[in-house]
Amino acid sequence: MATKLLALSLSFCFLLLGGCFALREQPEQNECQLERLNALEPDNRIESEGGLIETWNPNNKQFRCAGVALSRATLQHNALRRPYYSNAPQEIFIQQGNGYFGMVFPGCPETFEEPQESEQGEGRRYRDRHQKVNRFREGDIIAVPTGIVFWMYNDQDTPVIAVSLTDIRSSNNQLDQMPRRFYLAGNHEQEFLRYQHQQGGKQEQENEGNNIFSGFKRDFLEDAFNVNRHIVDRLQGRNEDEEKGAIVKVKGGLSIISPPEKQARHQRGSRQEEDEDEDEERQPRHQRGSRQEEEEDEDEERQPRHQRRRGEEEEEDKKERRGSQKGKSRRQGDNGLEETVCTAKLRLNIGPSSSPDIYNPEAGRIKTVTSLDLPVLRWLKLSAEHGSLHKNAMFVPHYNLNANSIIYALKGRARLQVVNCNGNTVFDGELEAGRALTVPQNYAVAAKSLSDRFSYVAFKTNDRAGIARLAGTSSVINNLPLDVVAATFNLQRNEARQLKSNNPFKFLVPARQSENRASA
């Protein structure tokens, strides 16, 4: 019987995640006819005892076109974001800080447990058991599948800032096109509720700040948990201060079960990846260089420019070869279950300390994560990119082949230009820290940094998002025959040759010397 129940639970878990090969729902007609894009700030702020949650309006036209919702949570020291689950998959980027997070997968075993001598109660030993708890750090991408309970905790003095994208157009979302948070505790306001009312949604109950247990009758919960009424009242959030909110302060901090070697690394302030399987997978990249940005820049600038350019190209070529090799192996023997749900890797670091996929010491760096790097993203149908640009450096005009891109500025500011299918400029302005810009699929975009260092994270609505460059080596123009370029643009052959070959860079173009002198 127990075996059947476990099998049933695991089957249910696969059903939760099993939309991995389903198509993403398409936007409604005319939703993506955007004449103007805007760099948006959060327009809703909900304070909590231990932090705050800010949200962007998901009814905004550009978010509706992309089918996503965006939010940002800030956790103070010893703050816990209460467990919740969502009606759509999430990608969470850790902009600042480090701490713990956990997820609960139905049917998976409780693999972490306390020592026997750790706790006693009512004359018998009790050992806490639970599913795996992970550490996160700045630069991590965390993948949260639909319906999976998620929580996070900040055990450090530095506030944690986590930016979350919810893919509400995912085929795994069987509700309406509105993000929903199902909290397991508290009686606070649901962060996207006000937008639901703006959209014309009906008020479901008088008290709209209750948790998922609040609607059950007490006797049901007393029988279900075999506990007394006092505990049930706490479970339902009765008489709790609404100001406690979704992020609560933990007096004295949480006691987290964690392997000793991980605790030791954390106490030493180690920047290494903490999961052994991540270390093994990423070791070749770290051997190629895992120093901080400034150290790499100083070392690399002593190299001749042609060597640096070749290094950038080789790095990208290696990335492409890795992708093609992985894709080939999966086509040959892919059953869709290379890793089980219970042991799936849920995070990967793409921050500035990780080895970049594209690097130019005079221009900047880019790091991407797709389902080839983090297989759980195949369930979510999402990917991400982290990049930084030096002052006046440029990311050449390009477009996303198969994904919408939501660019969130982390630091500094840059000038971006976005062009639609009619050749009209739909955005020509600055994107500064804390703002977000949606770039729809196939819209062309280029960026130039206006700060000493502009950094961003881009969430993409495809687990293998691809880019086509419109300028530079290996670009669309560069790969057209010379005579085709000349005839297409009505150029002389020598002019066409200049158009194809004058930019020796692939992605990142350093500032011109005249611009450097002017900025100095």
Swiss-Prot record:
Cystine crosslinks: C32-C65, C108-C342
Leader sequence residues: 1-22
Residue ranges that the Swiss-Prot or TrEMBL entry lists as coiled coil: none
Region Disordered: start-end pairs: 250-339
A GO molecular-function annotation: nutrient reservoir activity
Keywords of the record: Disulfide bond, Seed storage protein, Signal, Storage protein
Domain (Cupin type-1) ranges: 37-233, 348-497
SUPFAM superfamilies: RmlC-like cupins (SSF51182)
SMART domains for the chain: Cupin_1 (SM00835)
Organism domain of life: Eukaryota
Gene3D superfamilies: Jelly Rolls (2.60.120.10)
Name of one Pfam family that matches: Cupin_1
Database matches in InterPro entries: 11S_seedstore_CS, 11S_seedstore_pln, Cupin_1, RmlC-like_jellyroll, RmlC_Cupin_sf, Seed_Storage-Functional
Function: This protein found in the seeds of many leguminous and non-leguminous plants is the source of sulfur-containing amino acids in seed meals.
Oligomeric and partner information: Hexamer; each subunit is composed of an acidic and a basic chain derived from a single precursor and linked by a disulfide bond.
Family, per entry: Belongs to the 11S seed storage protein (globulins) family.
Name the record gives this protein: Legumin A2
Species name: Pisum sativum (Garden pea)
